[in-house]
Amino acid sequence: MAPVAMILHSLQLLQDQSFKDFGTLTVLFNPDEETGSSGSKKVIAELARQHDYVFSYEPPDKDAVTVATNGINGLLLDVKGKSSHAGSAPEAGRNAAIELAHQLLQLKDLGDPGKGTTVNWTLVKGGEKRNIIPSSASAEADMRYSDPSESDRVLADGQRIVKKTLVDGTEVTLRMEKGRPPLARNPGSEQLAKTAQTLYEKIGRSIEPIAMRFGTDAGYAYVPGSAKPAVLETMGVVGAGLHADDEYIELSSIAPRLYLTVALITRLSQDEAP
């Protein structure tokens, strides 16, 4: 709940200073973030497009602000074969597990290291009993990417590759479940990070702009090709061990990180003033 506390205390500090020059300041708390924000992603996107700046409060593991995050997709690979008795008539079957293994080898290089795209096959299922040739098999992959165009590229390449089968009579399909989009590197976020660095230096501290390899709700707020809103992620307190029993925050980071939110709102409001 540290992000919630950070936001509420930042608002209190602004109120204590009687600062109201920000135009419109909107706060959104969504309880479904851990499950993909399926119920709130539309609201996030709609509200973001009504504002000039968006701050998201994931916790950084060091004094940093994030200017880019990865997008997350899932790839679903399904093979349909034909079952048969493995002892008396194996030749009558069409082994979906063998075909799945063939496809996984073909698809192992779908990623693109040069673009930061990774595709890792992480779940495999096939067969029901040891004495039955499996009639179906499936696999799922985790895809991470920073270039928005990579979703279409990976799916197109994958669907082309799976047309080459090994086991005659099997059918193979590949589809994609789209998850969080990336917060791609963009001038607006980069400039916002520079402003954060300048403000942080005023209290004798330094802050680093970084790119994260995992996905966050900042991707829903980002509008590709548009200067606004400028989005900045990891505005929360510094900490680590997410979801673990030993998860923690650095208490010494609370005050400076509160300062950063308040100082950014104050500075950006002045910059936007007519």
List each model region and its residues.
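Short, conserved micro-motifs enriched in small and acidic residues
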Residues: M1-A5, P90-A97, Y248-A255
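Acidic/histidine-rich catalytic neighborhood of metal-dependent amide-processing enzymes
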Residues: M1-N70, S269, A273-P274
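Short glycine/serine- and small hydrophobic-enriched flexible loop segments
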Residues: L8-D16, H102-K108, A263-T266
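Short helix-capping segments at alpha-helix termini
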Residues: Q17-D21, K164-G169, K202-I203
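Midchain, well-structured core segments that form catalytic/ion-binding scaffolds
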Residues: E33-E34, K41-P187
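Active-site-adjacent substrate-binding region
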Residues: I98, H102-D112, N120, G179-L232
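Zn-dependent metallopeptidase/amidohydrolase metal-coordination segment
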Residues: V124, R205-E272
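Generic hydrophobic alpha-helical scaffold/packing signal
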Residues: D142, L155, Q159-V162, Q197, ...
